[in-house]
Structure formats: structure tokens, C-alpha cells
């Protein structure tokens, strides 16, 4: 297992934090389940690369194309998809944000990671929460339409940073 990035703390032995050979790509796994895929602003590749398996209801990819490269005009065909779990992707536009990850089922705190401007994180499984370390802007993308209270269950963690403070939204 690779060394933890300096801005990922308290990962302990409960979560596998794996940095891929491509600098700037991090996977967070728990019991072989992908909790999150973090694409740091430093990530570079000379082609197109997708980081999520085809079983995910959201796909996270990266494209690096030269000047003059064309992506032919296209539209998308209707395809029936069954979405059981909401997966969301956050783009950090400004500020510093602490991401807290929680185990699927038990909701035990597994670790925290600092997100910086330009970082993109896909949250696939388990619980998560955020704490703004400074004024921050985030852009969120997830499946719609939003199902209101049916879409998420809020919880007060028994351990971790938010167990000792009041959770907001």
C-alpha cells in the first residue's frame, strides 16, 4: 500500500488508501468496496482515461486533447438504467474542504481527506460529510431528479471529527 498523501489523515487501518502510479489519482476502499475516487488537480495523462468501473451509475473520466482535436457532433440515445444508489461528484472550485468518509452499514468514521481547488471526487459508497476549512465553492453533480428525504439518511457519527461538533446540512 502506498504512503498516504500528506492531506489525507486518520485513515488508520480501517480503510485502504491507494494512490495509483499516475500522480494525482487516489482510490479509497473499504472491504473491497470503492468509497471514493479522488482526482487531484495535479493529475495528468496524455490520452483519455476512465477511473470507474462500468457498474457505477456515474462514470469519472479525464481527457487530454491537443489544439485542433475534434470530438464529432453527437447526441445520446435513450438507455434504460437502474440506479439503486445515488453517487455524486464534487468539483472543488475554491477554498479548502475536509471530506470525512464513513463505513457502509456501520457508519463508523474511517478517515478524512483535505480537498483543494481543482480537485474532483466521486463518492460511490458509504457515508460522507464535509467541513469547510475556509470559505469554499463546490459544484455537485449527481443523478436526478433529487428524491428529497428519500435520497439520503442523515446521521450523527459515533466517532470522528463530527462526533464532537454540531453537524450542519
Briefly describe each language-model feature range:
Residues 62-84:
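Conserved short histidine dyad/triad with adjacent acidic residue
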Residues 66-67, 85-103:
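Glycine- and acidic-residue-biased ligand/ion/polar-headgroup-sensing regions
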Residues 73, 99-100, 121-123, 127-133, ...:
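Short beta-strand His + acidic residue motifs that chelate non-heme Fe in jelly-roll/DSBH
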Residues 129-169:
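Double-stranded beta-helix
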Residues 103-125:
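Short acidic-glycine-tyrosine-enriched beta hairpin
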Residues 1-62, 164-169:
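A short, N-terminal "cap"/entry segment at the start of jelly-roll beta-barrel domains
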Residues 66, 92, 116, 123-124, ...:
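A short, compositionally biased micro-patch
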Amino acid at each position: 500500500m502506498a504512503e498516504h498523501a500528506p492531506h489525507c489523515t486518520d485513515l488508520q487501518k480501517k480503510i485502504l488508501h491507494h494512490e495509483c502510479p499516475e500522480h494525482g489519482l487516489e482510490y479509497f476502499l473499504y472491504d473491497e468496496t470503492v468509497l471514493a475516487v479522488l482526482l487531484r488537480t495535479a493529475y495528468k495523462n496524455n490520452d483519455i482515461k476512465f477511473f470507474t468501473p462500468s457498474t457505477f451509475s456515474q462514470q469519472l473520466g479525464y481527457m487530454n486533447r491537443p489544439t485542433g482535436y475534434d470530438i464529432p457532433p453527437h447526441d445520446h440515445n435513450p438507455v434504460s438504467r437502474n440506479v439503486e444508489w445515488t453517487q455524486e461528484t464534487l468539483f472543488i472550485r475554491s477554498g479548502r474542504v475536509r471530506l470525512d468518509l464513513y463505513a457502509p452499514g456501520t457508519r463508523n468514521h474511517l478517515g478524512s481527506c483535505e480537498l483543494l481547488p481543482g480537485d474532483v471526487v466521486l463518492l460511490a459508497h458509504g457515508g460522507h460529510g464535509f467541513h469547510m476549512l475556509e470559505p469554499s465553492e463546490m459544484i455537485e453533480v449527481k443523478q436526478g431528479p433529487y428524491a428529497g428525504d428519500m435520497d439520503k439518511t442523515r446521521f450523527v457519527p459515533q466517532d470522528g471529527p463530527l462526533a464532537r461538533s454540531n453537524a450542519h446540512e
